[in-house]
From Swiss-Prot:
It comes from Hyperthermus butylicus (strain DSM 5456 / JCM 9403 / PLM1-5). The keyword Plastid does not apply. This is S-methyl-5'-thioadenosine phosphorylase. Pathway: Amino-acid biosynthesis; L-methionine biosynthesis via salvage pathway; S-methyl-5-thio-alpha-D-ribose 1-phosphate from S-methyl-5'-thioadenosine (phosphorylase route): step 1/1. It is an enzyme of class 2 (transferase). Homohexamer. Dimer of a homotrimer. The lineage of its organism: Archaea, Thermoproteota, Thermoprotei, Desulfurococcales, Pyrodictiaceae. Phosphate binds at residues 20, 62-63, 95-96, 195. The gene is mtnP. It holds the Pfam family PNP_UDP_1.
Length: 274
């Protein structure tokens, strides 16, 4: 078993995991940086802890500031473990994704309810030595948190899709045209990205309420239409501002503790351990 470092003295109720384009939350007051050590190594970056709407909030840029860590090299276990050490109950992940559907347009927000894992070489569990756990992933996202995100995005007037299947590929390369057509036509996935897995299953093992704000930047290559870097950069900038506004409005309304009547995230291990 790995050595367990002492728990940090700082605490947080809610965590934001920032994806491509969101390297600084920009909404936290009295923010300070903390270096957190975990038995699985170091997280992607220093964790920023501050306040928003009376809540203690932790922010972690998934790729590190400056986008220096590719998807397949992210230390997902260290990231999730560090948030657990801080006492986090809620995890709001933000991700840039490509669209596999005509009606999921660049600039739209998707709050996925399912995923398909097409990654190949990542570490998927905390339970790989001495203890075996089989967590249920039938409904992989916290439904309570999903509904809060959806209602907040709608209140702000954004185009939001309340359901969607996220297919997670290994990266860092993008799909071929043939692969993209398979994801769309055979697997019936709606959006595509590179970072959801194993983040989502590790959050489940850590008994955290986890949901994703997926921000559509462009159509994947199935669409066979030209996409310029300029256009993607413009949409990503707009999406980042949308994400910040959602977080600013959403976080103050989350209760300190998840409602066990509305979600089972915090008891995911009760039926998982053998």
């Amino acid at each position: 078993m790995p050595d367990f470092p002492p728990k940090p003295s700082v605490k947080a109720d809610i965590a934001i995991i920032g994806g491509s384009g969101l390297y600084d939350p920009g909404v936290l007051e009295n923010a300070k940086e903390y270096k957190i050590y975990t038995p699985y190594g170091e997280p992607s970056d220093y964790i920023i802890v501050g306040e928003l709407g009376g809540k203690r909030v932790a922010f972690l840029p998934r790729h590190g500031r400056g986008h220096r860590i590719p998807p397949h090299k992210i230390n997902y276990r260290a990231n999730i473990w560090a948030l657990k050490m801080l006492g986090v109950k809620w995890v709001i992940a933000v991700s840039a994704v490509g669209s596999l559907r005509e009606d999921y347009k660049p600039g739209d927000i998707v709050v996925p309810d399912q995923f398909i894992d097409m990654t190949k070489s990542r570490v998927y569990t905390f339970f790989d030595e001495g203890i075996v756990a089989h967590v249920s992933m039938a409904d992989p996202f916290c439904e309570h948190l999903r509904q809060e995100i959806i209602s907040t995005a709608r209140e702000l007037g954004y185009r939001v899709h309340p359901r969607g299947t996220y297919i997670c590929i290994e990266g860092p390369r993008f799909s071929t045209r043939a692969e993209s057509r398979v994801w769309r036509e055979v697997f019936k996935a709606d959006i595509i990205g590179m970072t959801l897995v194993p983040e989502v299953n590790l959050a489940c093992e850590a008994q955290l309420c986890y949901a994703t704000i997926a921000l559509v930047t462009d159509y994947d290559v199935w669409a066979e239409r030209p996409v310029t870097a300029e256009e993607v950069a413009r949409v990503m900038k707009e999406n980042t501002e949308k994400a910040k506004k959602i977080l600013y409005k959403l976080i103050p309304r989350l209760p300190p503790e998840p409602d066990k009547a509305r979600c089972s995230c915090c008891s995911s291990l009760e039926t998982a351990l053998l």
